[in-house]
């Protein structure tokens, strides 16, 4: 990667407020530096101390880090624990009646669930899974609405040592099918439908379609939660109603004690080369990362009401809905709906209603709400808030300032968190009682995280110059491998050409400023970031080319003030170039096609048609040229090797 010049200049800085510091878990830069130096002096001992402090072990570990077979690192691997026990049972002696979850439905129904009630529901469902013959090590795909039942399903899997793979409810039947096949799932947990923004979306019908696509004989059971009550097709020998499965089950289910390295879940994330990657996380190391970040980054206190708006189909929903908040005994809000239904103040109404103290959402949501003006949030009482968080993509400085001044009323710290599906928990983020914030920067690594920006050789990049973002030492919450694909894991995350394969390569470019703060600059591969979600170009291109009208396709991202990026598709049809009316009709057909193949989130915003794609005479796609075309920029690249220059004019036409 050539050196990247940083053009962002941001000089505003916001030290932690004295009132916040007085009550913070980590107070001041001296405390932060002391923790960081402790980790440098005794790296393994630092993490062992935290693991003993925050995790309840059935069998204590004696080994800390096994680095004898890099990059396949192991942590605490002679210890035993159960994740569900750590999230539920250990709270029952002191706070069984404390509210664990405040659920707010799409239509405004509120359900409160205590730790005792949640424990009972998880045990009943886990017993139901066992009654179906599901055992430790089996894989289950979860395709659920954003309701308490999704958390119950995940926790029940963890309770009996079953590896769950959650699929976002907006993904298509084909996406569900691919994940079922790759995981070798023995069961699918779903619902009749989900409701979002006043609309219903089929889930069970999508699962049925997925199971009819190929050899899915590994799936012997489909468990269906009755949500909307709509009529759905039924296969009596395979399908089971959730309520029938759990009705006669005991409220107690002995946890299965598993090795610290036992896989807790796989979560599929987009790659730049087509097939989604099954990111595999361990039990103990993953949980430790979630707990530590709840304590440090979110500065958790027992009276907090925590609300992370993410769906459990994404890693943020795993770490900061299903596992992190419950492991520390927090009360949290779970929301089924969208920010603007049935009115544009829905987020602020929920914060006011439930006295939310910690609010964690995506820049996409923030940008969409900015457009509605500052008057709207001012109608609501947001005085309960004490901390704001941002996740999913870098937040631009002006959105940060709006979030801080309008929502946080210039008193709530904003924690801009950098992390990934693969890291499992926060890596770089401002500890709010210690680190001064800069709008647009994720600031400094957490203690124990050895992050750096390096050039192609693995040497430190110059200050202010872009380079590869890496983590130089293994850390407990990192992915262990890619499901059934260890070589892809090694080549993707520990490539031999950077520092001999010893560094974790994040796939992001970044630079550091004069204070050592990290600034994320974007992806170094061809993964798109649409509304905070990573989507592979190859997957979308493959879907387009699968349509009988399409001969070739390439997609790139185009900056969008609300969604971060939108997808622009450059398409070569099998026939001649269409006229304007035909082009509009074909473009809409292809948009719908991609939505059905992958999911609505992958729907191209723009489709442009040309006689062929811009390639060099050696046949290499000129993707950077496409990015310039998508953005309406003046072409500055050398086009002397372009095979057919006339297509530049053709691809300038937006449909």
Swiss-Prot record:
Record-listed CoA binding positions: 196-199, 316, 531
InterPro entries, sorted: Ac_CoA_lig, ACAS_N, AMP-bd_C, AMP-bd_C_sf, AMP-dep_synth/lig_dom, ANL_N_sf
Residues the record lists as N6-acetyllysine modifications: 620
Protein residues bound to Mg(2+): 545, 547, 550
Keyword presence, Ion transport: no
An individual GO BP term: acetyl-CoA biosynthetic process from acetate
Co-factor requirement: Mg(2+)
PTM info: Acetylated. Deacetylation by the SIR2-homolog deacetylase activates the enzyme.
Class of the enzyme per the UniProt entry, highest EC level: ligase
Reactions mediated catalytically: acetate + ATP + CoA = acetyl-CoA + AMP + diphosphate
Record-linked Gene3D superfamilies: 3.30.300.30, N-terminal domain of ligase-like
Ribosomal protein found in the keyword field: no
Enzyme Commission no: 6.2.1.1
Pfam families in the record: ACAS_N, AMP-binding, AMP-binding_C
SUPFAM superfamilies cross-referenced by the UniProt entry: Acetyl-CoA synthetase-like (SSF56801)
GO molecular function, one term: ATP binding
Positions bound to ATP: 392-394, 416-421, 508, 523, 534
GO CC annotations, alphabetized: cytosol
Keyword annotations: Acetylation, ATP-binding, Ligase, Magnesium, Metal-binding, Nucleotide-binding
Record-stated family: Belongs to the ATP-dependent AMP-binding enzyme family.
NCBIfam families found in the cross-reference section: Ac_CoA_lig_AcsA, PRK00174.1
PANTHER family linked: ACETYL-COENZYME A SYNTHETASE, ACETYL-COENZYME A SYNTHETASE 1
Function comment: Catalyzes the conversion of acetate into acetyl-CoA (AcCoA), an essential intermediate at the junction of anabolic and catabolic pathways. AcsA undergoes a two-step reaction. In the first half reaction, AcsA combines acetate with ATP to form acetyl-adenylate (AcAMP) intermediate. In the second half reaction, it can then transfer the acetyl group from AcAMP to the sulfhydryl group of CoA, forming the product AcCoA.
Protein name, per record: Acetyl-coenzyme A synthetase
Species of origin: Nitrosomonas eutropha (strain DSM 101675 / C91 / Nm57)
High-level lineage: Bacteria, Pseudomonadati, Pseudomonadota, Betaproteobacteria, Nitrosomonadales
């Amino acid at each position: 990667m050539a050196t990247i010049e940083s053009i962002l200049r941001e000089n505003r800085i916001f030290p932690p407020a004295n009132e916040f510091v007085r009550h913070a878990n980590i107070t001041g830069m001296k405390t932060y530096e002391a923790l960081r130096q402790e980790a440098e002096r005794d790296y393994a001992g630092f993490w062992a101390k935290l693991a003993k402090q925050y995790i309840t072990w059935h069998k204590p570990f004696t080994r800390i880090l096994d680095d004898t077979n890099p990059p396949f690192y192991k942590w605490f691997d002679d210890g035993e624990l159960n994740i569900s026990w750590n999230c539920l049972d250990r709270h029952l002696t002191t706070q069984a009646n404390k509210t664990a979850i405040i659920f707010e439905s799409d239509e405004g129904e509120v359900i409160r669930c205590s730790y005792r009630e949640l424990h009972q529901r998880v045990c009943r469902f886990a017993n139901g899974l066992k009654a179906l013959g599901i055992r430790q090590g089996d894989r289950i795909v979860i395709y659920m609405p954003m309701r308490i039942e999704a958390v119950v399903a995940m926790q029940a899997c963890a309770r009996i040592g079953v590896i769950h793979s959650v699929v976002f409810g907006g993904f298509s039947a084909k996406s569900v099918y691919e994940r079922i096949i790759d995981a070798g799932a023995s069961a699918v947990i779903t619902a009749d439908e989900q409701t979002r923004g006043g609309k219903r979306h089929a889930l069970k019908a999508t699962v049925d379609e997925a199971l009819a696509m190929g050899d899915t004989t590994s799936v012997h059971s489909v468990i269906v939660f009755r949500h909307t009550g709509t009529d759905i097709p039924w296969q009596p020998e395979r399908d089971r109603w959730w309520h029938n499965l759990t009705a006669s089950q005991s409220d107690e289910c002995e946890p299965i004690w598993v090795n610290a390295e036992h896989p807790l879940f796989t979560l599929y994330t987009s790659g730049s080369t087509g097939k989604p990657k099954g990111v595999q996380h361990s039990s103990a190391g993953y949980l430790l990362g979630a707990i530590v970040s709840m304590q440090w980054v979110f500065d958790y206190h027992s009276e907090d009401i925590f609300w992370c708006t993410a769906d459990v189909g994404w890693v943020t929903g795993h770490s900061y809905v299903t596992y992190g908040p419950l492991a520390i005994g927090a009360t949290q809000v779970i929301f089924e709906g969208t920010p603007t239904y049935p009115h544009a103040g829905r987020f602020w109404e929920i914060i006011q209603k439930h006295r939310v103290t910690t609010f964690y959402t995506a820049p996409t949501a923030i940008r969409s709400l900015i457009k509605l003006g500052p008057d709207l949030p001012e109608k609501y009482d947001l005085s309960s808030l004490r901390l704001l968080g941002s996740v999913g993509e870098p937040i631009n400085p002006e959105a940060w300032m709006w979030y801080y001044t309008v929502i946080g009323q210039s008193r709530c710290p904003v924690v801009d968190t950098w992390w990934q599906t693969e890291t499992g928990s926060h890596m770089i983020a401002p500890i709010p009682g210690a680190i001064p914030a800069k709008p647009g920067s994720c600031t400094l690594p957490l203690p124990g995280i050895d992050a750096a920006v390096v050039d192609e050789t693995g040497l430190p990049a110059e200050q202010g110059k872009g380079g590869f973002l890496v983590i130089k030492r293994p850390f407990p919450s990192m992915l262990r491998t890619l499901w059934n694909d260890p070589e892809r894991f090694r080549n993707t995350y520990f490539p031999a050409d950077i520092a001999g394969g010893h560094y974790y390569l994040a796939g992001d470019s970044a630079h550091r400023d004069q204070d050592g703060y990290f600034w994320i600059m974007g992806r170094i591969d061809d993964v798109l970031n649409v509304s905070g979600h990573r989507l592979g170009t190859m997957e979308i291109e493959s879907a387009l080319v699968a349509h009988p009208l399409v001969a070739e396709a390439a997609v790139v991202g185009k900056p969008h003030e609300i969604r971060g990026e939108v997808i622009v598709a450059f398409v070569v049809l099998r026939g001649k170039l269409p006229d304007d009316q035909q082009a509009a009709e074909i473009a809409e057909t292809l948009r719908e096609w991609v939505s059905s193949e992958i999911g609505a989130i992958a729907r191209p915003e723009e489709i442009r048609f040309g006689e062929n794609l811009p390639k060099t005479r050696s046949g290499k796609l000129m993707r950077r040229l496409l990015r310039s075309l998508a953005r309406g920029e003046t072409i500055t690249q050398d086009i002397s090797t372009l095979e057919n220059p006339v297509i530049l004019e053709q691809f300038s036409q937006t449909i």
